Amino acid sequence: MTAPGFVEFPDSPFHLYQPYPPAGDQPGAIDALTEGVSDGLMFQTLLGVTGSGKTYTMANMIARLGRPALVLAPNKTLAAQLYAEMREFFPRNAVEYFVSYYDYYQPEAYVPTRDLFIEKDSSINEHIEQMRLSATKSLLERRDTVIVGTVSCIYGIGNPGDYHAMVLILRTGDRISRREVLARLVAMQYTRNDADFTRGVFRVRGETIDIFPAESPELALRLTLFDDEIESLELFDPLTGRVRQKLPRFTVYPGSHYVTPRETVLRAIETIKEELRERLAQLIADGKLVEAQRLEQRTRFDLEMLQELGFCKGIENYSRHLSGAAPGEPPPTLIDYLPADALMFIDESHVTIGQLGGMYRGDRSRKETLVQYGFRLPSALDNRPLRLEEFEARMRQCVFVSATPAAYEQEHADNVVEQVVRPTGLVDPIVEVRPAHTQVDDLLGEIHKRAALQERVLVTTLTKRMAEDLTDFLSEHGVRVRYLHSDIDTVERVEIIRDLRLGVFDVLVGISLLREGLDIPEVSLVAILDADKEGFLRSERSLIQTIGRAARNLNGRAILYADRITDSMRRAIDETERRRAKQIQHNTDHGITARGVSKAVRELIDGVVAPAGHDALESAVPAEVLTDEKAMAREIRRLEKLMMDHARNLEFEQAAAARDALNALKSRLLLDGVG
């Protein structure tokens, strides 16, 4: 086997780290897809089973073709997983993360039946905002860029032309006055704060201007002037003040994607006034005097703010005027920042394509009510996500990636490439059908067998009620079981999956949360209850995805409990058996012995330690703290604050680790009778 190392390809800026050479179906898939892109195919499908290394195939394609790439995932959890993997494959290149930066988002809305107007309310995650700005900067500056994102990329983010026109290029020796630098920074939506130096802030001390770039995760820029000439540019650590690097040139990017040059704002003010006059005349003619008064009051306040400050609350609702677009034209999005020859990968495309199609309709119905009742001008309707056909028109050469492609991919794929054989030699699980009327008793027996072998079990039910009842029943019979449902937040979900892998419990019961992207090699049995109840949760695609959860284990098996075999079941079983036969044949032909996946738990959710008992507590907390009542109280407060800070920054693993230490410390207090 070839030793791990970096691989480079001709005319490609990427340095691909290969922990192992492509194996199984990977070499053929990489060659076929790369050739398809080179031949100009617009749409291709990678039909890759669970555990076949689809991300590795994508990384090899990107490196070979040497083009920037956008990888779309259906949710933040899978996007984070892909981002971590891509960073491992491209540690020397720009791998960026572009997801929604809202921790909490309540859009403005009006409920006519109750005459209730709900103001927009949101909480922005600073770290994700920085990563979004870093993503667009990388696209504008370098070719070796891979962006991992979600459906968030079809929402408007400001015109790339305006964004690029606002950058401030600084070179040592250039002549520029201190006043001009400060004016440019304010226009770019940077804030002056000499006391609290954080992202998007600048501070001034005589002829020295410190700028903390909005897209920078940790380093700031020190600009030193002498007699209106740039004397030096230095990157420094804002915490220690230590200079890291002297630079001949630096580009400061705007503090927000929504920056607009002053002349554009002034032009927009005039077109907003014109639209306001027309809309007021229409409302008055229709006898809607309250709506007309409301609209005039709200819009004139916004115009005043735009005139004085250059921006206002809810400025995105005037995006059509600011971009100079015609009514009905789509807004500029991240897709507009991509070069024409970029690659697109849509992961779990059977889910993601549906999301891309659904975003526009929900947004439209809410805004139409706001316009109808005088809360917004009609141009607010053009601040929206892209429609599916608009997204299609902007798509670059695209690869759909899924184990179960849906109708859209089947219609659009010019080339379908199968990746069925796994590099590990693992084959798809054996699928059995057993009677549904004895399903619970039979399942209990199977669970005891698996638990004795230190293996895990996933059980999927049709309803919440049944999942709860089954969990109670199994628990009463001595089974270590947990229940995963939609009310559980992301932190706890990650924790439950971690505990399942660590063997804290043996059985996980769920409804539809046990399908795409769950990577648990310890699971050797998947049980699907009531498999013959046709519907969304028991469709062919859902069944194949659920069966696939047992495909990472050497002893993988799936049991479908049903009193009759439905069409969906038949197709799912036939497809699984077809793949299994192909995998076994490949192993026989090449003398491959299947080996189980041995994956460290920290890789699933990096940074979480094992459950915190006394040993873990004593290693995490100084010994003197454990013997002093006041010190323990202080430590509890510190851990609570740390946990909340990590949760706010979406650092769920660190938040969970802090929570474990906190719980262990509280238990210690109770056990020792301290405090």
From Swiss-Prot:
**Which parts of the sequence form the motif Beta-hairpin?**
101-124
Q: Which SMART domains match?
A: DEXDc, HELICc
All copies of the Helicase C-terminal domain together span 439-605
Location in the cell: Cytoplasm
| Keyword tags | ATP-binding, Cytoplasm, DNA damage, DNA excision, DNA repair, Excision nuclease, Nucleotide-binding, SOS response
One Pfam match, given by its short name, reads Helicase_C
Q: Spell out the protein name for this chain.
A: UvrABC system protein B
Protein species of origin: Bordetella parapertussis (strain 12822 / ATCC BAA-587 / NCTC 13253)
